[in-house]
Protein backbone atom coordinates (compact mmCIF):
# COMPACT_ATOMS: atom_id res chain seq x y z
CA UNK A 1 0.00 0.00 0.00
CA UNK A 2 1.32 3.46 -0.90
CA UNK A 3 1.98 5.46 2.26
CA UNK A 4 3.83 8.46 0.82
CA UNK A 5 4.81 10.32 -2.33
CA UNK A 6 7.46 13.01 -2.63
CA UNK A 7 8.97 15.04 -5.44
CA UNK A 8 11.76 17.60 -5.55
CA UNK A 9 13.34 19.69 -8.29
CA UNK A 10 16.50 21.77 -8.16
CA UNK A 11 18.28 24.09 -10.56
CA UNK A 12 21.73 22.81 -11.49
CA UNK A 13 23.28 26.29 -11.35
CA UNK A 14 21.98 26.71 -7.78
CA UNK A 15 23.58 23.40 -6.82
CA UNK A 16 26.85 24.39 -8.50
CA UNK A 17 26.88 27.64 -6.49
CA UNK A 18 26.26 25.72 -3.24
CA UNK A 19 29.18 23.40 -3.97
CA UNK A 20 31.49 26.34 -4.77
CA UNK A 21 30.49 28.34 -1.67
CA UNK A 22 30.61 25.49 0.83
CA UNK A 23 33.26 22.80 0.41
CA UNK A 24 31.72 20.74 3.24
CA UNK A 25 28.34 20.63 1.48
CA UNK A 26 29.26 17.42 -0.35
CA UNK A 27 30.26 15.73 2.92
CA UNK A 28 26.96 16.77 4.52
CA UNK A 29 24.78 15.46 1.68
CA UNK A 30 26.53 12.34 0.35
CA UNK A 31 27.35 9.09 2.14
CA UNK A 32 30.92 7.77 1.92
CA UNK A 33 29.97 5.42 -0.95
CA UNK A 34 28.27 8.27 -2.81
CA UNK A 35 31.29 10.53 -2.23
CA UNK A 36 33.63 7.92 -3.73
CA UNK A 37 31.52 7.73 -6.87
CA UNK A 38 31.24 11.55 -6.98
CA UNK A 39 35.05 11.92 -6.97
CA UNK A 40 35.38 9.70 -10.06
CA UNK A 41 33.01 11.82 -12.19
CA UNK A 42 33.83 14.61 -14.64
CA UNK A 43 33.20 18.20 -13.47
CA UNK A 44 29.96 18.55 -15.45
CA UNK A 45 28.65 15.20 -14.27
CA UNK A 46 29.45 16.02 -10.61
CA UNK A 47 26.84 18.80 -10.50
CA UNK A 48 24.17 16.54 -12.04
CA UNK A 49 25.08 13.72 -9.67
CA UNK A 50 24.88 15.68 -6.43
CA UNK A 51 21.78 17.59 -7.59
CA UNK A 52 20.01 14.32 -8.37
CA UNK A 53 21.00 12.79 -5.02
CA UNK A 54 19.97 15.94 -3.15
CA UNK A 55 16.58 16.04 -4.91
CA UNK A 56 16.05 12.31 -4.24
CA UNK A 57 16.81 12.67 -0.54
CA UNK A 58 14.51 15.70 -0.26
CA UNK A 59 11.78 13.79 -2.13
CA UNK A 60 12.10 10.90 0.33
CA UNK A 61 11.77 13.26 3.29
CA UNK A 62 8.62 14.69 1.69
CA UNK A 63 7.22 11.18 1.11
CA UNK A 64 7.75 10.37 4.79
CA UNK A 65 6.11 13.67 5.69
CA UNK A 66 8.77 14.90 8.11
CA UNK A 67 11.17 16.77 5.86
CA UNK A 68 14.91 16.53 6.44
CA UNK A 69 15.46 16.51 10.18
CA UNK A 70 13.91 13.30 11.42
CA UNK A 71 15.87 11.52 8.72
CA UNK A 72 19.26 12.95 7.73
CA UNK A 73 20.86 13.16 4.31
CA UNK A 74 23.49 10.62 5.41
CA UNK A 75 20.78 8.12 6.48
CA UNK A 76 19.75 7.92 2.83
CA UNK A 77 21.99 6.25 0.25
CA UNK A 78 21.39 5.97 -3.47
CA UNK A 79 23.24 3.28 -5.38
CA UNK A 80 22.73 2.43 -9.03
CA UNK A 81 21.96 -1.16 -9.99
CA UNK A 82 23.72 -3.01 -12.83
CA UNK A 83 21.48 -1.28 -15.38
CA UNK A 84 22.08 2.22 -13.98
CA UNK A 85 18.71 2.59 -12.26
CA UNK A 86 18.91 4.28 -8.84
CA UNK A 87 18.00 2.31 -5.72
CA UNK A 88 17.46 4.01 -2.37
CA UNK A 89 18.36 2.54 1.01
CA UNK A 90 17.30 4.38 4.15
CA UNK A 91 18.28 3.57 7.74
CA UNK A 92 15.18 2.60 9.71
CA UNK A 93 12.99 2.03 6.65
CA UNK A 94 13.74 -1.63 5.87
CA UNK A 95 10.04 -2.49 6.17
CA UNK A 96 9.19 -0.19 3.27
CA UNK A 97 9.50 -0.53 -0.48
CA UNK A 98 10.99 2.64 -1.95
CA UNK A 99 10.51 3.47 -5.63
CA UNK A 100 12.86 6.16 -6.93
CA UNK A 101 13.22 7.99 -10.22
CA UNK A 102 15.84 10.67 -10.93
CA UNK A 103 16.08 12.72 -14.11
CA UNK A 104 18.27 15.59 -15.35
CA UNK A 105 18.05 18.22 -18.05
CA UNK A 106 20.53 20.96 -18.94
CA UNK A 107 19.16 23.13 -16.15
CA UNK A 108 17.31 20.93 -13.64
CA UNK A 109 17.46 17.71 -11.66
CA UNK A 110 14.21 16.17 -10.45
CA UNK A 111 13.46 13.15 -8.28
CA UNK A 112 10.28 11.32 -7.39
CA UNK A 113 9.83 8.86 -4.50
CA UNK A 114 6.91 6.54 -3.85
CA UNK A 115 6.95 4.89 -0.43
CA UNK A 116 5.06 1.65 0.16
CA UNK A 117 4.48 -0.54 3.17
CA UNK A 118 5.33 -4.22 2.75
CA UNK A 119 2.26 -6.40 3.00
Curated annotation (Swiss-Prot):
Transmembrane segments: none
Keywords annotated in UniProt: Cytoplasm, Fatty acid biosynthesis, Fatty acid metabolism, Lipid biosynthesis, Lipid metabolism, Magnesium, Metal-binding, Transferase
Catalysed reaction, written as an equation: apo-[ACP] + CoA = holo-[ACP] + adenosine 3',5'-bisphosphate + H(+)
Localization (cell): Cytoplasm
Cofactor section: Mg(2+)
GO molecular function term, any single one: holo-[acyl-carrier-protein] synthase activity
GO BP term (any one): fatty acid biosynthetic process
Positions that bind Mg(2+): 8, 58
Chief location: cytoplasm
InterPro entries in the record: 4-PPantetheinyl_Trfase_dom, 4-PPantetheinyl_Trfase_dom_sf, ACPS, Ppantetheine-prot_Trfase_dom
An example Gene Ontology CC term for this record: cytoplasm
Enzyme Commission code(s) on record: 2.7.8.7
Gene3D superfamilies: 4'-phosphopantetheinyl transferase domain (3.90.470.20)
The organism's place on the tree of life at top rank: Bacteria
Function recorded in the entry: Transfers the 4'-phosphopantetheine moiety from coenzyme A to a Ser of acyl-carrier-protein.
Protein name: Holo-[acyl-carrier-protein] synthase
Organism (species): Oceanobacillus iheyensis (strain DSM 14371 / CIP 107618 / JCM 11309 / KCTC 3954 / HTE831)
Species classification: Bacteria, Bacillati, Bacillota, Bacilli, Bacillales
Amino acid sequence: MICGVGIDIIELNRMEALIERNERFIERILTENEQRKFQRLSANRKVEYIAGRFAAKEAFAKAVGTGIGKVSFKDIEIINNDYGAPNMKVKGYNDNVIHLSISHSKTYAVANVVLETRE
